[in-house]
């Protein structure tokens, strides 16, 4: 069943030596990324731990579990994902949308648009640009916040989704996933294996059950992402 699947995927991808996240009292957790993180959040809200501010995506599903399980820590959880964004757009808003929060835990999911928009929008980026831009952003972040705990989430595309024309996506998109995992190792970040989780889950139910378009997860896909994130970070 799904809990065993999640454990198996994380164990297989991360091994025994993977870093875990440590939470302290009043810990600030920030989710960053694109539309998958955004989840239709209210961008006028600056509150933490609220439905409008957290959106309705995996960040909300993850936050509710964290707030319940770690109630004694009085966590402060924020979401600053913005739909459509690629790495260079993260960098453009990094001061106000990341560093000013002084997060103790910073979770980043970025990459699907860095590839998808080369197919759909004429974007001229490459996997090399993606990797180098993200590496530079992570270096800068660690310079400014040397004690931040990083969580790097694997970009994913659910095979069989309506927006995923497999011959145009694979194996090319795999290079972005490989680059992200490489960076997780370089920065001693927690790696969250979303692609592997969706690949495994698609053997239990078809792709359209998890993410109809293959990019934006539906309700069970959002919960799956939350479960994988919590398993990978050791915070379940």
Language-model-detected regions and their locations in the chain:
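Serine-esterase "nucleophile elbow" of acetyl-processing enzymes
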Residues: 3-80, 95-102
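Alpha-helical cap/lid subdomain in secreted, periplasmic
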Residues: 23, 56-76, 85, 89-236
């Amino acid at each position: 069943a799904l809990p065993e699947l999640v454990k198996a995927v994380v164990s297989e991808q991360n091994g025994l030596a993977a870093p875990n996240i440590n939470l302290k009292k009043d810990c600030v957790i920030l989710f960053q990324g694109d539309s998958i993180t955004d989840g239709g959040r209210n961008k006028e809200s600056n509150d933490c731990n609220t439905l409008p501010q957290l959106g309705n995506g995996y960040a909300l599903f993850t936050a509710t579990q964290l707030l319940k399980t770690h109630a004694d820590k009085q966590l402060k959880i924020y979401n600053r994902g913005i739909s459509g964004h690629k790495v260079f757009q993260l960098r453009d808003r990094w001061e106000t949308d990341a560093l000013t929060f002084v997060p103790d835990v910073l979770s980043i999911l970025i990459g699907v648009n860095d590839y998808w928009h080369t197919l759909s929008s004429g974007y001229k980026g490459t996997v090399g640009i993606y990797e180098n831009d993200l590496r530079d952003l992570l270096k800068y972040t660690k310079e400014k916040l040397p004690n931040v705990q990083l969580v790097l989430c694997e970009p994913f595309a659910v095979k069989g989704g309506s927006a995923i024309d497999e011959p145009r996506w694979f194996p090319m998109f795999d290079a972005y996933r490989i680059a992200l995992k490489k960076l997780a190792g370089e920065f001693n970040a927690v790696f969250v294996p979303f692609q592997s989780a969706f690949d495994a889950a698609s053997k239990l139910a078809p792709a359209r059950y998890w993410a109809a378009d293959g990019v934006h997860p539906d309700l069970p896909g959002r919960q799956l992402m939350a479960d994988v994130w919590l398993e990978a970070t050791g915070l379940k």
